[in-house]
Amino acid sequence: MLHSASEILKQLDSGEVTAVEVIAQSLAAIRASQPTINAFTHVAEETAMQAAEAVDADRKAGKTLGPLAGLPVAIKDVLCTSDMPTTCSSKMLEGFVPPYDATVVARLKSAGAIVVGKTNMDEFAMGASTETSAMGVTGNPWDTTKTPGGSSGGAAAAVAAGAVPLSLGTDTGGSIRQPAAFCGITGLKPTYGRVSRYGLVAFASSLDQAGPMGWSVDDVAIGLQAMAGYDPRDSTSVNAEVPDFTPAMAAEDVRGMRIGVLREGLDQDGISPAVRDALATAESVFREQGAEIVEVELPHSKYWVPTYYVIAPCEASSNLSRFDGAHYGYRVADAEIAAADSGPLEAMYSLSRAGGFGSEVKRRIMVGTYALSEGYYDAYYNQALKVRRLIRNDYDAAFQQVDLMLGPVTPSPAFALNEKTDDPIAMYLCDLFTVGANLAGVPAISLPGGFDAVGLPVGVQLQAPVMEETRLLRAGNVFQMASDFHTRRPPTFTANHSQ
């Protein structure tokens, strides 16, 4: 059975299992779950088994191995991989294989991890349900009629279904934390700049950040240790020393920590009682473990969502302008170009983009282009940047008073597939509690925090000051030692490992 990443690594080190056995189990679980979950856009069976055989041979020969040697991992299909397609779950990039690995992928491989495949996502990471994918909808392993969240829905579902113990997602406005909450796993969005964005196909460059997803805080700490660090190829990478995150896992309590509870937005319509209950439970657990619990406010939190949905589409409009049919990706047939009323170059651009992008991507490009246009730049984009500064100031002020902030991840547990697809505003409000961390650039972690009346997972969120991932990991690990929410598995996981 595929357990947590930390358990598998111990078994590999002790010789209890071989890398070939672990990878074979992972691939078998993918095959079993793919028809109902559809977590993967590409499965690398042959190369994964070859890599596993190489790890076992090196171990037998007594060679020095990387800290993740033999561990199966899955990569969100927005991160470049030189040996398999990177499609961003879009027709625009269908079949595209990059000539290089993203830095985070290269670092995981260098640490010995074995990439078993690429995971499904909302197209170009734009969505909160993995329903905008051109590769089909992904189901939630707890209930396949529900969404796994988005945009890293496939990465979260792959862990929850037992296909891999560790996956790599990206978070622009909550895209690691929301799927982690919906799928009952742990997901970490690092500080902006802590992890390289080189090789990450950009959605919103000032917001995007890659991070690990696994069952426990211990697992995501292992992943973060391998992928974090300065990268000169990324101009936004922070040249700061990466601490050893292991001591954070040894903490037995949170004595001396002051944790501020965020309640903004909890009184709105549509907030599930299970979300409030999970937050109350987390408060109680942290108080019992020695933390001082206080109230904290972020005065401009009501502007998080509107600010995000100006800045992110503006950056997307710019970033996605490179996909034009000329150099790579989808290109409309020459016959259609010749039949168009406009000139051939304009026809190639417009028809290729119209055919290659899905409706949600087109919507955000249009919104961003409008907000950046000459008559509206100051009223929308420039104004949003000013509000973003106020939001960052709110965080700075709050962290003068507290060590961490505790709050919800999502307004509700996982909602039904197709429930919000025709209502973009309802879908955007799924980001109500998560986009603040992206706008401020601070690290945040989603922890399994409970279950609703029908057994769907509910998450809780911790946020920390810039570059204080160690603080997050310490508190999160203490919470998980004092609770068992992260140890529960969905029916799909049990079915995949019943043999």
Swiss-Prot record:
GO annotations of cellular component type: glutamyl-tRNA(Gln) amidotransferase complex
MF-aspect GO terms: ATP binding; glutaminyl-tRNA synthase (glutamine-hydrolyzing) activity
Protein's GO biological process: translation
Residue positions of the active site: K76, S151, S175
Keyword Ligase tagged: yes
Protein's recorded name: Glutamyl-tRNA(Gln) amidotransferase subunit A
Keyword vocabulary terms for this entry: ATP-binding, Ligase, Nucleotide-binding, Protein biosynthesis
PANTHER family associated with the record: GLUTAMYL-TRNA(GLN) AMIDOTRANSFERASE SUBUNIT A, TRANSAMIDASE
Keyword presence, Cell inner membrane: no
